[in-house]
């Protein structure tokens, strides 16, 4: 973490359980991020929190620290049964649930609290086997949680802590009815600690907090600037015919260490992947119909640096903790202006700088005014020389080949095709 991203407040300054502090310091967490410094005094006092902060600001560790401390500092209810978790953390996507679980594991090892994971797609029996042995903290997506609850594999009557992560995304994906179903099976709001964290807190999310939380305190970090001052934004106006060649030229010029390219449809993502894989890039494809095990493998390869570029739909835009992303390319401007914020929030994280490049083509340029109104500023426009765009490009690969691209990354210098103007 960059020092500019941290406050002077230390975790050890709070009256946290010693095992929690020990686990944090062992992982190198000493100073709090702004959202952590705001949230912890409230949660340690037993107050509910609804927190808004840009992605990469430490929301996950804020609610995990609070959850582990609360469970260690408060006894479980009397006569708690083996199928009754003490804390429930709900996430909108499988990938985010897996990431939260990974972040929680060091705390679990240090404290002895048991973790469970529940998400759809695969691993039903494996997840169930863990639950049957009893867990303290259950992390999951709403569909699988409801499935287990209806079959009495889990019972929520002993819940002492509940967390909603990326609550606005829950609305986007239509999960609010599921969330309310789960809340109705928990103890009343005033008998548990409730936390809600998200990059955006819309009116409907605040309404949910009012319904399901106990007079929550609202906390915000940098609410006046939605896109983050560390992200350099840039906009091009290509024709549809030049759009792909412009993207490939920009990649050659920027030569990003780690980049995510967002497009609005699965078909468009597959097209982009085919062009880049054919050109020798180490590129992965992440769309909604990719099998869960493969999605997790691709994310792991990208995080490790075995892949340099990830082409994705917005399934990857929310909540995932992928470190050191240097560039985000909006091949398509998103239809939802909030998705623009979440997309470019993949870069410029944890105090680092980042670069966002958007292509406003003939098809999606009409989305730009709403995006600029939402973020509160115009995106700087850059020009390019059409005659300098790459032309010697190989025929794109088709998806009959492996999606993650197995060609070695080129080690030569980028082609000299600087844009003019």
Curated annotation (Swiss-Prot):
Which reaction is this enzyme known to catalyze? ATP + H2O = ADP + phosphate + H(+)
What Enzyme Commission number does this protein have?
3.6.4.13
Entries under CDD domains matching the protein: DEADc, SF2_C_DEAD
Where do the Helicase C-terminal domain residues begin and end?
A: 245-390
- Give the start-end ranges of region Disordered: 392-421
What would be one Gene Ontology cellular-component term for the protein?
A: cytosol
User: Could you confirm whether the keyword Cytoplasm appears in this record?
Assistant: yes
Q: Any keyword RNA-binding?
A: yes
Q: Where does ATP bind?
A: 53-60
Which Gene3D superfamilies does the entry link to?
Answer: P-loop containing nucleotide triphosphate hydrolases
The annotated regions of Low complexity compositional bias extend over: 402-414
- GO molecular-function annotation terms? ATP binding; ATP hydrolysis activity; RNA binding; RNA helicase activity
Helicase ATP-binding domain residues are 40-219
Q: Which residues form a coiled coil?
A: none
InterPro entries to which the protein is assigned, alphabetical: DEAD/DEAH_box_helicase_dom (IPR011545), DEAD_box_RNA_helicase (IPR050079), Helicase_ATP-bd (IPR014001), Helicase_C-like (IPR001650), P-loop_NTPase (IPR027417), RNA-helicase_DEAD-box_CS (IPR000629), RNA_helicase_ATP-dep_RhlB (IPR023554), RNA_helicase_DEAD_Q_motif (IPR014014)
Q: Can you supply a Gene Ontology BP term from the record?
A: RNA catabolic process
Q: Which UniProt keywords apply?
A: ATP-binding, Cytoplasm, Helicase, Hydrolase, Nucleotide-binding, RNA-binding
Sequence motif Q motif, location on chain: 9-37
Query: Primary place of residence?
Result: cytoplasm
Where is the short sequence motif DEAD box located? 165-168
Q: Which SUPFAM superfamilies match?
A: P-loop containing nucleoside triphosphate hydrolases
- Which PANTHER family does this one have? ATP-DEPENDENT RNA HELICASE RHLB, ATP-DEPENDENT RNA HELICASE RHLE-RELATED
**Family indicated by similarity:** Belongs to the DEAD box helicase family. RhlB subfamily.
Report the protein's function. DEAD-box RNA helicase involved in RNA degradation. Has RNA-dependent ATPase activity and unwinds double-stranded RNA.
Question: Cross-referenced NCBIfam families, in alphabetical order?
Answer: PRK04837.1
Designated name of the protein: ATP-dependent RNA helicase RhlB
Which gene does this sequence derive from? Answer: rhlB
């Amino acid at each position: 973490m960059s020092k500019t991203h941290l406050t002077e407040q230390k975790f050890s300054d709070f009256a946290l359980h010693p095992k929690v502090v020990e686990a944090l310091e062992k992982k190198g967490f000493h100073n709090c991020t702004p959202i952590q410094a705001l949230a912890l005094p409230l949660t340690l006092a037993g107050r509910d929190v609804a927190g808004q902060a840009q992605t990469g600001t430490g929301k996950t560790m804020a609610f995990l620290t609070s959850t582990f401390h609360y469970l260690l500092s408060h006894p479980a209810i009397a006569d708690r049964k083996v199928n009754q978790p003490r804390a429930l953390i709900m996430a909108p996507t499988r990938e985010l649930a897996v990431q939260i679980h990974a972040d929680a594991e060091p705390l679990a090892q240090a404290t002895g609290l048991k973790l469970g994971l529940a998400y759809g797609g695969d691993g039903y029996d494996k997840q169930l086997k863990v639950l049957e042995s009893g867990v303290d903290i259950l992390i999951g997506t709403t569909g699988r949680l409801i499935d287990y609850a209806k079959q009495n594999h889990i019972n929520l009557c002993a819940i002492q802590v509940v967390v909603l992560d990326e609550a606005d995304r829950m609305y986007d994906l239509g999960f609010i009815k599921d969330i309310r179903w789960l809340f109705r099976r928990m103890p009343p709001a005033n008998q548990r600690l409730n936390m809600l964290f998200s990059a955006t807190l819309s009116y409907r999310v605040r309404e949910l907090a009012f319904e399901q939380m106990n007079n929550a305190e609202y906390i915000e970090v940098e609410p006046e600037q939605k896109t983050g001052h560390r992200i350099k934004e840039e906009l091009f106006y290509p024709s549809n015919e030049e759009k792909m060649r412009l993207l490939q030229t920009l990649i050659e010029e920027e030569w990003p260490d780690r980049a995510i390219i967002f497009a609005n449809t699965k078909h468009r993502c597959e097209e982009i992947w085919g062009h880049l894989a054919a050109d020798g890039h180490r590129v992965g494809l992440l769309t909604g119909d990719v099998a869960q095990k493969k999605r997790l493998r691709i994310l792991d390869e990208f995080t490790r640096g075995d892949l340099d570029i990830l082409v994705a739909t917005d399934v990857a835009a929310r909540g995932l903790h992928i470190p050191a992303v240097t560039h985000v390319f909006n091949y398509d401007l998103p239809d939802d202006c909030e998705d623009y914020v979440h997309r470019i929030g993949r870069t410029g994280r944890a105090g680092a700088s980042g670069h966002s490049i958007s292509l406003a083509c003939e098809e999606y340029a009409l989305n730009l005014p709403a995006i600029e109104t939402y973020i509160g500023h115009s995106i700087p426009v850059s020009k390019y020389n059409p005659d300098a765009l790459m032309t010697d490009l190989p025929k794109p690969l088709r998806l009959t080949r492996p999606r993650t691209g197995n060609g070695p990354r080129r080690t030569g210098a980028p082609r000299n095709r600087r844009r003019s103007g």
